């Protein structure tokens, strides 16, 4: 750090802004990772058709204005003490814009799967670049969505100077510069540093090379300086112009950094409405159904593997709304965390849920089957089962899904040695214990729950010269607060039920596909 003496607490401060699915969160941190202030602002989603999901980009900027100003006020922070800013965002949320950033259409959210047919055409090419996407292009990603815009909204496509992601757009709003995060490009745009960079051969096969002229071609890795905060942006946010703006990336990958998962054999378990699994490897691991391997997507010289479950916390929310609304209402009235109330219900039932099995494919399966037509299932019901059994089985089914991903990685040569957990789902101590018991691996917790915001602030601190590397920054700014150890006797019980969980998909797959196809299953998210 060039002889810089780190204060115990206080400035310099670093502002992390994260555009999420349900809202935007801003946070201010010091060099030791202490939270100075945190603020959240929600915004709506629009669902004009089944399987479609859109947002108004102007809502993101309004949310940024509100949360940054609130952080400055509530944290009693002087704007001149903000040393650097970075922004991360959900991915892949795509929008067509003119060169001034004016949207030509609502943003097509990451969960939107209208580009299913375009993704299938991409997969049919069997282009070698797909090897770095788990062998299968997702309709969530940039190329399928951009191709959908061209084919279904030709005037919008023709009039758009750029087709960008939410993260590009937010950085432009801060700096008036169009750049692309290398993190996003590698993970969602089929950019491959070890295979020549931009996916020209794939685009040529699709006769879609023109999209290259609509992408910001300057690539910056996370932690690299983009520019300075403009006068206009500073006015909107209640800051001062000239603050360095540092490149961020995908929110889940920022969360990985905020968990200190920047070393080989570690895995970040980010549990929200869905669950993301990011693992760090010294070597490329090609695993069917696992996205990647992504070279230098975050950490120089290292590869990242990404697994995912499309619906985990969202299933628990579904259960709470439909079967435990009274308990949830009572918890809200007394200011109790909903997971505390739900844990009390699920804890009434022993491991294995008395033979009840939940298949967590309510929104399809992302890893390892990459099957958008898969459906959720609850089987093994008897008249002795209660709603507590169903909730316990949901907890276990989601944890079985994570274990399935870990087992898939292990089969292909990658052994996870340490798991670090965050996200709203990490507030459930019972659920984390079930994850640890099923996987038979310790789970580490950190002091800051909002790890994507912390990780984004770490990008800012590193990129503005206060640390020599991202790993050096995480060493100082991320603190382990606890560890959950597996219960070996519970693990032995779960081994029996995990086998039934895995076999259930193959027993039900044809039925799932028949029903999904009849009911418009292509709306289901990957």
Which residue stretches match the model-derived regions?
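Gly/Ser/Thr-rich active-site cleft segment
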Residues: 19-21, 32, 129-250, 316, ...
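N-terminal phosphate-binding loop and adjacent alpha-helix
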Residues: 39-78
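Short, hydrophobic/amphipathic alpha-helical packing segments
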Residues: 61-69, 143-146, 250-254, 312, ...
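Stable alpha-helical structural segments in soluble proteins, enriched in small hydrophobic residues
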Residues: 63, 67-75, 170, 259, ...
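Phosphate/pyrophosphate-binding loops at sites that engage ATP/ADP/AMP, CoA/4′-phosphopantetheine
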Residues: 64-83, 153-157, 202-212, 235-237, ...
């Amino acid at each position: 750090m060039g002889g810089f003496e780190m204060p115990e607490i206080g400035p310099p401060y670093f502002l992390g802004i994260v555009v999420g699915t349900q809202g935007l969160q801003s946070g201010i941190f010091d060099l030791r990772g202490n939270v100075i202030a945190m603020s959240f602002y929600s915004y709506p989603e629009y669902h004009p058709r089944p399987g479609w999901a859109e947002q108004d980009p102007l809502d993101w900027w309004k949310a940024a204005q509100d949360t940054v100003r609130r952080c400055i006020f509530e944290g009693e922070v002087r704007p001149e003490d903000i040393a650097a800013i970075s922004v991360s965002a959900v991915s892949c949320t795509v929008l067509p814009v003119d060169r001034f950033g004016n949207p030509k259409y609502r943003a097509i959210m990451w969960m939107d799967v209208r580009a299913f047919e375009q993704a299938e055409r991409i997969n049919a090419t069997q282009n070698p670049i797909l090897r770095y996407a788990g062998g299968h292009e997702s309709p969530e990603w940039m190329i399928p969505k951009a191709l959908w815009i061209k084919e279904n909204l030709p005037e919008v496509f023709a009039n758009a100077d750029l087709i960008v992601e939410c993260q590009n757009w937010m950085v432009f709003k801060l700096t008036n510069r169009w750049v692309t995060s290398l993190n996003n490009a590698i993970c969602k745009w089929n950019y491959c540093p070890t295979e020549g960079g931009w996916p020209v051969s794939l685009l040529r096969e699709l006769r879609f090379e023109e999209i290259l002229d609509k992408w910001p071609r300057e690539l910056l890795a996370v932690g690299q300086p983009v520019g300075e905060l403009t006068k206009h942006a500073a006015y909107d946010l209640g800051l001062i112009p000239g603050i360095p703006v540092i490149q961020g990336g995908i929110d889940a990958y920022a969360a990985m950094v905020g968990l200190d998962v920047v070393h080989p054999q570690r895995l970040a378990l980010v549990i929200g409405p869905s669950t993301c699994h990011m693992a760090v490897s010294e070597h490329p691991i090609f695993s069917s159904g696992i996205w990647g391997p992504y070279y230098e997507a975050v950490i120089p010289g290292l590869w990242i593997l990404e697994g995912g479950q499309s619906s985990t916390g969202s299933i628990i929310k579904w259960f709470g709304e439909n079967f435990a609304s009274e308990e949830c209402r009572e918890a809200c009235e007394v200011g109790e965390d909903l997971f505390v109330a739900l844990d009390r219900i699920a804890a009434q039932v022993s491991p294995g849920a008395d033979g009840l099995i939940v298949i967590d494919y309510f929104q399809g399966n992302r890893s390892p089957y990459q099957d958008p037509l898969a459906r959720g299932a609850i089987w093994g019901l008897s008249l002795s089962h209660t709603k507590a059994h169903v909730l316990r089985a949901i907890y276990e089914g989601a944890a079985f899904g994570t274990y399935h991903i870990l087992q898939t990685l292990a089969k292909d040569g990658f052994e996870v040695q340490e798991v670090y957990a965050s996200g709203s789902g990490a507030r459930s101590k019972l659920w984390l214990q079930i994850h640890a018991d099923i996987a038979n691996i310790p789970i580490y917790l950190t002091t800051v729950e909002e790890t994507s915001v912390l990780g984004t602030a770490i990008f800012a601190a590193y990129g503005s010269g206060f640390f020599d590397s991202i790993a050096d920054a995480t060493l100082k700014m991320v603190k382990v607060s606890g560890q959950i150890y597996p219960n070996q006797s519970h693990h032995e019980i779960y081994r029996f039920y995990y086998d039934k969980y895995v076999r259930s998909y193959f027993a039900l797959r044809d039925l799932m596909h028949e029903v999904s196809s009849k009911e418009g299953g292509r709306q289901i998210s990957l």
